[in-house]
A protein has these predicted regions:
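RNA pseudouridine synthases
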Residues: 1-184, 290
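Short, surface-exposed secondary-structure edge patches
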Residues: 45-49, 216, 260
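Short, P/G- and charge-enriched loop/turn segments at secondary-structure junctions
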Residues: 72-73, 187-193, 252-257
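Pseudouridine synthases involved in rRNA/tRNA modification
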Residues: 1-30, 197-200, 205-212, 220, ...
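Short beta-strand micro-motifs in enzyme catalytic cores
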Residues: 84, 161, 213-215, 266
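Well-ordered beta-strand positions
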Residues: 77-78, 129, 181, 204-207, ...
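Short histidine-centered loop motifs in beta-beta connectors
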Residues: 41-43, 210-217
């Protein structure tokens, strides 16, 4: 990917990049050692002067190190030069971790990029738990990733999840506000505890059945395991969840053979960080609701 723009006033290139392109100082510092900065077609350093009318270009090519490419089938929902959205299956990590360096979505994406001749990085914008499925968004370079970080901070990304739960909220719509606390001892589990971080989830009931319900969930905050914990703590755990469940929800899930947890990132809406266009990406997957054969959230 290459950014191109025209200088409108005098100044140093570094100031131009930070002011006009909103680049972080760390990214500018990294680019200056990669021969990635050009003014009027000439590779220059960050202290190079720019004048009104100068053509400035920034090459944002990246390489990926630290894990190996793997052949795997990927479901690409959307792609352009700045980002890619994949439909992640359940049971797969988004990115390698210290304990697992293979079999992740990123391993397959590395093969995809190399096969298509793309010099892209792998920067997850949205991550999903191993057993949560649906839309995963990844930036192709650090510049776009930083744009998404700022978009997150300003509330410019809307995520919609579908969840089939055991039980149901009394109200048809509402907000769950419960702090999420990370348990100690190296555990990944979270608990509702006053010592935790503020966490807010909006919900809307889409369908109700005798024992279960289909919910649309909108995480206002993005804490680890937030949706799963909030549903369980509110009395309607997600079906198939191996960690955040009640005895009754686990028994019901086992009775109907529900595995993995029925939580799907069905839709992601945002303003494209490069084009400025309203963008909506939808998963092709759906949660399984045993009391309804075709439950969807459009």
């Amino acid at each position: 990917m290459q950014l191109r723009c025209t200088a409108s006033r005098e100044g140093k290139l570094e100031s131009f990049l930070r002011r006009e392109l909103s680049m972080s100082s760390s990214l500018v510092s990294r680019l200056k050692w990669q021969d990635a900065l050009l003014v009027n077609g000439e590779a220059v350093h960050t202290n190079h002067p720019v004048h009104p009318g100068d053509a400035v270009a920034v090459r944002l090519d990246e390489t990926v190190e630290g894990f190996e490419p793997e052949e795997m089938a990927l479901s690409v929902l959307y792609e352009d030069e700045a980002l890619i959205a994949l439909d992640k299956p359940a049971g797969m990590l988004t990115h390698p971790s210290p304990s697992r360096n293979e079999g992740t979505l990123a391993n397959g994406l590395l093969t995809y990029y190399r096969a298509s001749g793309q010099k892209c990085g792998i920067h997850p914008v949205s991550r999903l738990d191993r057993d949560t499925f649906g839309v995963v968004l990844l930036a192709k370079n650090a510049y776009v990733h930083e744009k998404f970080r700022l978009l997150h901070q300003s509330g410019g990304m809307k995520k919609t999840y579908a969840a089939c739960v055991f039980g149901a909220p009394e109200a048809d719509a509402g907000t769950i506000e419960l702090p999420v606390y990370k348990l100690g001892g190296g555990s990944l589990l979270r608990a509702v505890d006053a010592r935790g971080q503020q966490a807010v989830t909006e919900f809307a009931v889409q369908c109700r059945w005798a024992h279960t319900a289909l919910l649309a969930l909108h995480p206002v905050t993005g804490r680890t395991h937030q949706l799963r914990l909030h549903c369980m703590a509110s009395g309607f755990p997600i079906l198939g969840d191996p960690q955040y469940h009640s005895d009754a929800s686990r028994a019901f899930s086992e009775r109907f053979g529900i595995c993995p947890q029925q939580l799907c990132a069905v839709r992601l809406e945002f303003c494209h960080p490069i084009t400025g266009e309203a963008t909506c990406i939808a998963s092709k997957q759906r949660v399984r609701c045993p009391e309804e054969t075709a439950a969807t959230i459009g």
